[in-house]
């Protein structure tokens, strides 16, 4: 039936939009404290999630059930997609918050009002909307196309507007719920779930899905370890996660499935623990089982939600309170240094995950045993339509899975073609850059511009700091995978996202032979990550040590971290490059700890105007050193160095003479002239240019 297909497609599109709005409000709020490293007050916009509380007011409930008001709310919801076109981040945040609040009210009204078939299609549209979203993110290499590109934002806005206009035409019956027979009402009242538990379970399930399955690469990033056994790569392993999510949604329709039993809950809890505590493939397999469990909870949890009472205000408000508490707690686990009460949430993702599993389990075990389909299929006259709707939704679901798998396959093939396309060389260039999670200083996505900038540097090895944006309050974006595929580099994600660091990644034009992830001593401040790597550069093995120390005020942390990294440097091979963010001045205690006890040399010991980024080395011949201004793309510059790998690492002479005229050195070791020429002092212009008395060359 074409009309059923249309209903499913339109509701799924609108469900995808709702998920996208909810996913983006967190990163937009988080952007502002990211700039100041403290709470700004704009966190208050999170109350947009609590808009269902107005539905507890009877006159307001009657008002939003009127067609003209529901039409207005639908238009506001879809219009908030255009927040991406706003001239500044604050206006974008305000428009987005308005869209989130409107979307939640629309969902509450339409889920609790209308015919059983209408409600069934709307609710399943929301569930399938999550699958639509992850499939879109596959095709956009983990990014949400609504919030990443102008063209895709406009296309989805247009399609959503068309869908909304169509829905407005069907909203006339929303204020007239389908009547239930007397026996059905009595049975429903007797088996009605607790509204408080139903709301808490729904909010927890929304956040759990957002946190762990908001993008199919996330499971791999929870399970990741160092090379040569890093665990499954997100592409193609993300396809397994997608298949498991789809399979989980189908499970409740199987007659043999006991989705309300204690055994299934124990299975889900064990898989959650496996994802949190196991490593590489064991963690990834646990994540797949957890995906099946999580998806299988959706029909039952939503069935309990809409059957918990006639007025959705209380239930939806409780749901969103739990969602907010959980996403804030998730942020507190990593940002504990900068927020009140952070000491109690430090690295306690286990408490968060355990609490959510307990809430979902209680709702599963003590609520009605009927799922969403059975609760809404009450009229004999509509059973045929329900069966057809279920059939079409299954077909649509597996069509989405096929589209997602195709996207992964095409991306994987394109990425494989890019890797290893380099000529043999004895020179290597390395760069370090604090990335700010892929957002520029104005709050917009910086990925495309950043990839272009990094490509223009010509660096062979790049370490990116502040790179773990896979967390829900930063957009669930896999920046390592995105940059690796865009630039054609081998990648190392760094310590798992479950270890509560801000992230550090490595990108290499040459194969990574082995690597090891480290969590440096951090008794007082934020968790400091490091990676040690060995890279095969045209048959020569060169070690790299990359790190991000804690903040300047955490003196003990920096002292212990410098000691730990100096040991890593000392134990590295004779040829090693250090790229670090150490928040200490040249000649300071931590600087000397690295150079003297780590047995490395500063690329330019005469550069005294540094504070954070440093490049050091041993066993190589230095050729050049450059600093490139950030031009508001981040809050920090790019530093680069060029080296030659000596033929005999035990018998060579390092370059000592410093020159600033590029004409005095071979053209093949020149830095890209696109960044201008030697410049004294800081470059205050809004362009990427050499500055701070660089570039320098060594003879």
Curated annotation (Swiss-Prot):
Protein name in the entry: PGAP2-interacting protein
SUPFAM superfamilies registered for this protein in UniProt: DNase I-like
Chain's gene name: CWH43
Signal peptide: none
Gene Ontology cellular component annotations, sorted alphabetically: endoplasmic reticulum; extracellular region; membrane
Main location: membrane
Chain intervals for the UniProt region annotation (Required for function in lipid remodeling): 607-627
Compartmental location: Membrane
Entry similarity comment: Belongs to the PGAP2IP family.
GO biological process per UniProt: brain development; cell adhesion; cerebrospinal fluid circulation; cilium organization; GPI anchor biosynthetic process; membrane protein ectodomain proteolysis; neuromuscular process controlling balance; peptide secretion
InterPro entries membership: Endo/exonu/phosph_ase_sf, GPI-anchor_lipid_remodeler, PGAP2IP_TM_1nd, PGAP2IP_TM_2nd
Glycosylation site positions: 455
Membrane topology summary: Multi-pass membrane protein
Quaternary structure, from the entry: Interacts with PGAP2/FRAG1.
Keywords of the record: Glycoprotein, GPI-anchor biosynthesis, Membrane, Transmembrane, Transmembrane helix
Record-annotated membrane-spanning stretches: 13-33, 41-61, 93-113, 123-143, 196-216, 237-257, 273-293, 316-336, 349-369, 390-410
Pfam families: 6TM_1st_PGAP2IP (PF23022), 6TM_2nd_PGAP2IP (PF23021), Exo_endo_phos_PGAP2IP (PF23226)
């Amino acid at each position: 039936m074409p009309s059923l297909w249309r209903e499913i497609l339109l509701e799924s599109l609108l469900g995808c939009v709702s998920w996208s709005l909810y996913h983006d409000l967190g990163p937009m709020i988080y952007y502002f404290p990211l700039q100041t490293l403290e709470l700004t007050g704009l966190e208050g916009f999170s109350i947009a999630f609590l808009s269902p509380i107005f539905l507890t007011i009877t006159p307001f409930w009657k008002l939003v059930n009127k067609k003209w008001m529901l039409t207005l709310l639908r238009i506001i919801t879809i219009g908030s997609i255009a927040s991406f076109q706003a001239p500044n981040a604050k206006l974008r945040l305000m428009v987005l918050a308005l869209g989130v609040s409107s979307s939640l009210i629309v969902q509450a009204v339409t889920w609790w009002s209308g015919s059983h078939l209408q409600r069934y299609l709307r609710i399943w549209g929301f569930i399938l909307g999550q699958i639509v979203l992850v499939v879109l993110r596959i095709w956009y290499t983990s990014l949400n196309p609504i919030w990443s590109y102008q063209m895709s934002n406009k296309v989805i806005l247009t399609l959503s507007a068309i869908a909304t206009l169509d829905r407005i035409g069907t909203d006339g019956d929303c204020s007239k719920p389908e009547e239930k027979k007397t026996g059905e009402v009595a049975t429903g009242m007797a088996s009605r779930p607790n509204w408080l538990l139903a709301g808490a379970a729904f909010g927890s399930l929304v956040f759990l899905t957002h946190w762990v399955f908001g993008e199919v690469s996330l499971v791999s990033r929870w399970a990741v370890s160092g090379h040569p056994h890093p665990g499954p790569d997100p592409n193609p392993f993300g396809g397994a996660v997608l298949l498991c999510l789809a399979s989980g949604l189908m499970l409740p329709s199987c007659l043999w499935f006991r989705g309300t039993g204690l055994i299934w809950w124990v299975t889900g809890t064990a898989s959650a623990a496996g994802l949190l505590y196991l490593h590489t493939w064991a963690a990834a397999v646990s994540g797949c089982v957890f995906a099946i469990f999580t998806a299988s909870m959706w029909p039952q949890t939503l069935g309990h939600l809409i059957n918990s009472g006639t007025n959705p205000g209380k239930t939806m408000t409780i749901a969103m309170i739990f969602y907010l508490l959980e996403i804030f707690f998730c942020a507190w686990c990593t940002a504990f240094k900068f927020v009140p009460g952070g000491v109690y949430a430090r690295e306690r993702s286990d408490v968060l995950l355990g609490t959510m599993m307990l809430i979902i389990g209680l709702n599963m075990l003590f609520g009605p045993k009927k799922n969403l389909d059975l609760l809404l299929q009450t009229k004999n006259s509509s059973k045929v339509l329900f069966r057809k709707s279920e059939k079409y939704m299954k077909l649509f679901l597996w069509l989405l899975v096929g589209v997602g798998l195709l996207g992964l396959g095409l991306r994987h093939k394109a990425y494989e073609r890019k890797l290893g396309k380099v000529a043999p060389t004895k020179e290597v260039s390395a760069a370090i850059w604090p990335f700010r999670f892929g957002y520029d200083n104005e709050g917009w996505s910086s990925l495309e511009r950043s990839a272009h900038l990094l490509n223009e540097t010509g660096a062979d090895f790049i370490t990116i700091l502040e790179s773990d944006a896979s967390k829900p309050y930063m957009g669930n974006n896999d920046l390592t995978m995105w940059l690796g595929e865009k630039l054609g580099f081998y990648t190392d994600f760094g310590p798992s996202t479950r270890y509560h660091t801000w992230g550090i990644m490595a990108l290499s034009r040459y194969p990574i032979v082995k690597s090891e992830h480290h969590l440096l001593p951090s008794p007082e401040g934020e968790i400091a990550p490091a990676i040690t790597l060995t890279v095969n550069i045209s048959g020569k093995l060169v070690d790299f040590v990359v790190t991000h120390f804690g903040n300047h005020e955490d003196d003990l942390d920096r002292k212990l971290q410098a000691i730990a990294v100096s040991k890593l440097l000392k134990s590295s091979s004779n040829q090693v490059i250090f790229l670090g963010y150490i928040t200490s001045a040249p000649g300071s205690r931590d600087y000397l700890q690295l150079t003297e006890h780590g047995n490395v040399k500063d690329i330019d010991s005469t550069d005294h105007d540094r504070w954070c980024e440093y490049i050091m080395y041993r066993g190589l011949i230095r050729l050049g050193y450059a600093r490139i201004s950030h031009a508001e793309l981040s809050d920090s510059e790019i530093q680069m160095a060029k080296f030659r790998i000596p033929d005999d690492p035990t018998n060579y002479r390092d370059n000592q003479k410093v020159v600033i005229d590029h004409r005095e050195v071979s053209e093949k070791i020149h830095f890209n002239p696109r960044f201008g020429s030697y410049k004294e002092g800081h470059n205050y212009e809004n362009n990427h240019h050499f500055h701070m008395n660089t570039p320098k060359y060594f003879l």
